């Protein structure tokens, strides 16, 4: 007697119903499934990491800008007297530029300068962190999918591409050095995070 199995090879997978034919519960499950599929895909990981990095970078940049000290500031002041309008400090349009402390300015101008500076620094930091998160997560996911492996080399390669992308405007040498530095940093982080994944020692549960 030849064993032919349980006939599972003759069973065809269930066809998905159109969305408008589903019950409210099934529609919710279908929507959750679509969201999870997108979140676990490479484009989804890249988008989520980019948005998260942008938000964290903005908060960090805002915090660092708010901790700045009162430093000399070059601000244009009207040249009302001949004593201030000297040849060394006259700017464009008859405006003399003098070095002032921020605390010497009117309160409204102080607030305007501070918020403008904080906004610029926060936006710059957010762009950098968002770029790092988006490129790193996307490249790592693509490499992991192609290699079908989850090891340290995925992060090292992603770190190299990310660092090179950040420094490519400064030339090929800077891109190479930036990629190598970011790859080394990524390798160190991965080694630290995976240091507890190994086999426990033999005396782990012994007193």
Swiss-Prot record:
GO terms for biological process: protein insertion into mitochondrial inner membrane. Residues 1-46, 194-207 are mitochondrial intermembrane. Its main location: mitochondrion. GO terms for cellular component: cytosol; mitochondrial inner membrane; mitochondrial intermembrane space; mitochondrion; TIM22 mitochondrial import inner membrane insertion complex. Pfam families: Tim17 (PF02466). Keywords: Disulfide bond, Membrane, Mitochondrion, Mitochondrion inner membrane, Protein transport, Translocation, Transmembrane, Transmembrane helix, Transport. It is a multi-pass membrane protein. The chain crosses the membrane at residues 47-67, 152-172, 173-193. It comes from the Eukaryota. It is found in: Mitochondrion inner membrane. Disulfide bonds join 42-141. GO terms for molecular function: mitochondrion targeting sequence binding; protein transmembrane transporter activity; structural molecule activity. Component of the TIM22 complex, whose core is composed of TIM18, TIM22 and TIM54, associated with the peripheral proteins MRS5/TIM12 and the 70 kDa heterohexamer composed of TIM9 and TIM10 (or TIM8 and TIM13). Belongs to the Tim17/Tim22/Tim23 family. Essential core component of the TIM22 complex, a complex that mediates the import and insertion of multi-pass transmembrane proteins, such as mitochondrial carrier family members, into the mitochondrial inner membrane. In the TIM22 complex, it constitutes the voltage-activated and signal-gated channel. Forms a twin-pore translocase that uses the membrane potential as external driving force in 2 voltage-dependent steps. Mediates the insertion of precursor proteins in a 3 step process. This is Mitochondrial import inner membrane translocase subunit TIM22. It comes from Saccharomyces cerevisiae (strain ATCC 204508 / S288c) (Baker's yeast). The gene is TIM22.
